From Swiss-Prot:
The gene is cgkA. Pfam families: Big_2, Glyco_hydro_16. The active site is at E163 (nucleophile), D165, E168 (proton donor). Belongs to the glycosyl hydrolase 16 family. InterPro entries: Big_2 (IPR003343), ConA-like_dom_sf (IPR013320), GH16 (IPR000757), GH16_AS (IPR008263), Glycosyl_Hydrlase_16 (IPR050546), Invasin/intimin_cell_adhesion (IPR008964). GO terms for biological process: carbohydrate metabolic process. It is an enzyme of class 3 (hydrolase). Disulfide bonds join C98-C268. The record marks R260 as: Important for substrate recognition. Residues 26-299 form the GH16 domain. This is Kappa-carrageenase. It catalyses: Endohydrolysis of (1->4)-beta-D-linkages between D-galactose 4-sulfate and 3,6-anhydro-D-galactose in kappa-carrageenans.
Amino acid sequence: MKPISIVAFPIPAISMLLLSAVSQAASMQPPIAKPGETWILQAKRSDEFNVKDATKWNFQTENYGVWSWKNENATVSNGKLKLTTKRESHQRTFWDGCNQQQVANYPLYYTSGVAKSRATGNYGYYEARIKGASTFPGVSPAFWMYSTIDRSLTKEGDVQYSEIDVVELTQKSAVRESDHDLHNIVVKNGKPTWMRPGSFPQTNHNGYHLPFDPRNDFHTYGVNVTKDKITWYVDGEIVGEKDNLYWHRQMNLTLSQGLRAPHTQWKCNQFYPSANKSAEGFPTSMEVDYVRTWVKVGNNNSAPGEGQSCPNTFVAVNSVQLSAAKQTLRKGQSTTLESTVLPNCATNKKVIYSSSNKNVATVNSAGVVKAKNKGTATITVKTKNKGKIDKLTIAVN
């Protein structure tokens, strides 16, 4: 179902057309549905992209790469979502994994577009119709889902993070090579351990040679996530399957375009800028015709926080986490803190920020820290429910 042209209709007729469009979308069944099965379309994680809906999608979410997300790099027109990567020099706070610290005013050179669902889920069938970006190599159009990182889970075998890549396009040396991978953090021998596709190919990697150039036209990419299996599809054909060992956490559905080689280098389990800062091939855009999410009735039951919607009863907070333990700023600089309240289904996620030394650094109710004078200050975030806290140190040079 795509946009409906509405010209010179009276208001009641327009309303009927829109209601018909909504009804048509809701009644659709996924292509993998078998006779007798009932699947329900999840409206909060589905979109035909007739409008840019900021109530459904976050278009400027947290940064985690060597590019920065910008709201204006995500546009909707003619029934398509367009995510654009641009060559734009800028600075922001950057996590330096090799030195395990936040670095203020880190120089970066590219911006891009993202649409991250505000709603979360897990088990179900996910499908998007995507056309890749024209530039190759350099960017990777992606359709994926990922959870928060829950550092409070410390028992052996606990899964702190889950990520399912429905597809990542054009990030390898050959344009037709696609990745359909899994990532996770699991507690092993008492320590949180990243499991990446390169190090754990048996459980985490699926590679596929596409029978087409993904830059030239729209194709469908899908995944079916159940308690036991994860199965990937391209244009309705199965292209990979893995046992679902670790991917049971609530995840946000995401469409994005990331930067890749030759503009990036991978080290210390993250991307860093490379020496190549060329503007050639930029701006470049991926397009999304639609994204749809279904849950099968009667076969997707699970505990809250592991794939189903939150319960109607009150859910208490058990922890709050800041994205870093220490951050360095110069006098006059500011940064916005990112706090995660867990569990995801917690009813009251409101927090209060405070500073131990307002002469050094202040923090407002939105988590914006401003460096005042040289020294150190401890910033505390505290949940209104249960009073859970986390802290970070602000050092002002």
